[in-house]
């Protein structure tokens, strides 16, 4: 990864962060589905980075999200968990022959089906953790499941839409 790629990653991180805190922070579709588009940056962190580097980046990025959401570490906890299990999810989804390069994870490098499944798994786990922690003390199974499923679907759709609109470096896949 060269300096230009790192600068592009930083610009995308900042853009996604702005979209999250300015648009989606107070927006809930039908009062149920929230959108955690910031996960798009986290699940696209390069595989070339060591896990510890990704954990540090995720920690500071989601800590900023928690500050704006006024949620004391809930998003950070969930995001650190998914970045920690991400290598296992990738091993689970990698075909027998492997991939040419796992340096960049996007719809254009991995294919839409693979990326959608990958994002669904990680976003579902993240939203499950977030809403489980938030609902401690006032647990309602039906409401919680509705929030988890609808937020997962909305977030994955938004992440894919963001990639198609703003990530224009397409591969041959």
Question: Model-derived features: where do they sit?
Answer:
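Terminal, non-globular segments
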Residues: 1-173
């Amino acid at each position: 990864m060269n300096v230009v790629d790192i600068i592009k990653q930083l610009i995308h991180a900042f853009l996604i962060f702005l979209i999250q805190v300015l648009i989606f922070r107070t927006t809930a579709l039908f009062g149920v589905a929230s959108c955690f588009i910031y996960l798009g940056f986290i699940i696209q962190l390069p595989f070339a980075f060591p896990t510890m580097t990704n954990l540090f980046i995720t920690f500071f990025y989601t800590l900023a999200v928690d500050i704006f959401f006024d949620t004391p570490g809930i998003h950070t906890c969930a995001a650190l968990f998914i970045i920690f299990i991400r290598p296992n999810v990738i091993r689970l989804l990698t075909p027998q022959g492997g991939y040419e390069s796992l340096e960049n994870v996007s719809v254009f490098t991995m294919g839409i089906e693979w990326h959608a499944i990958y994002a669904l798994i990680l976003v579902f786990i993240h939203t499950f953790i977030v809403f489980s922690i938030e609902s401690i003390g006032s647990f309602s199974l039906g409401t919680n499941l509705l929030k988890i499923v609808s937020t997962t679907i909305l977030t994955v759709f938004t992440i894919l839409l963001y990639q198609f609109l703003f990530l224009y470096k397409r591969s041959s896949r």
